[in-house]
Amino acid sequence: VISNRAHLLEGKKLGESDKILSPNDDVNLSQSSNDTFPTAINIAAMKLITDNTLVNLRKLKNSLNKKSKEFNKIVKIGRTHLMDATPITLGQEFSGYVSQVDHGIKTIENALDHLSELPIGGTAVGTGLNTPKGYSSKIVKYISKNSEMSFKESLNKFEGIASHDCIVEMHGALKTVAASVYKISNDIRLMGSGPRSGLGELILPANEPGSSIMPGKVNPTQCEAISMVCAQIIGNDVAVSFAGANGHFELNVFKPLFAFNIIESSKILGDASLSFAKNCIDGIKPNKKRIEKFLNDSLMLVTALNSKIGYYKACLLYTSDAADERHC
């Protein structure tokens, strides 16, 4: 295409004479699709993850952190195995979410180092055949300057062309964050269930009417939306892992699959995190009456008596109260 365009710009017609630029000797000088393709994938992924994914995950973390501080004095019943457990503050519960997202951000940041290695200059199989001396270092510096990002030469261009482990590693980091965010969104959805027949401990923002047939119904659409995004990323990771295992000898030909999935996962995780923060987390309110009712009704408060009367006597109190409750 570039060669033909140059030919036309010189006033020539396609096919009437030799081309001004040779597609092989000029346009593709010192390059192979085997090293330029993975280089382009790494650049695109770095740009998207740095400018979108990480930026919006930090916004989600900040939104959760604000709610953690806001809810710090609201004591609620904890739940393990979906059953009543000992008390916890709503703020402490949200602080766990903050930590999950924070660890996820760090996991992605750590994976950026490997992703920043560019195999450009390795040409066909990683040896650098037909490239002039210093070509790789010069072009990597040029890419870094013009992209305003920090790139470096692949430590081993054979690995950079044949394996694409940097993509597998980075997508694994995205998958880890997706699993965390799925858990967070599901907790919030369950705590907001009801309003009368569910837990109803959280009041979620009413962003839109929830039903065309049930008046007044409000659905946790933001929780559901980001859950689907997380499921997609987890599915994409299976494909990326399989692609990573399919490098044969000096080349991995699954490059289009790597590119599609790392770009899609990075984009939808960033976009969904921003939407979840703005349209759900920022507007969450505690239903204090409901929280207090569950706390006061819970028999697990008896756990605090372990150090006073012992586990077995405390267990008898629990069993007795539970039996009385069942007979009511």
Whereabouts are the PLM-identified features?
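Amphipathic, heptad-repeat-like alpha-helical segments
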Residues: 48-60
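Long, amphipathic alpha-helical stalk/connector segments used for oligomerization, subunit docking
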Residues: 231-295
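Feature representing long, continuous alpha-helical segments
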Residues: 168, 212, 216, 220, ...
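Low-complexity, glycine/alanine/serine/threonine- and acidic/polar-rich repeat/linker tracts characteristic
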Residues: 44-47, 51, 264, 268
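Internal glycine-rich alpha/beta core junctions
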Residues: 1-33, 37, 55-58, 86-240
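Strongly charged, low-complexity linkers/loops
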Residues: 289-315
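Glycine-rich cofactor-pocket loops
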Residues: 68-92, 119-126, 198, 202-205, ...
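Conserved small/polar residues in nucleotide/adenosyl-binding loops
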Residues: 318-327
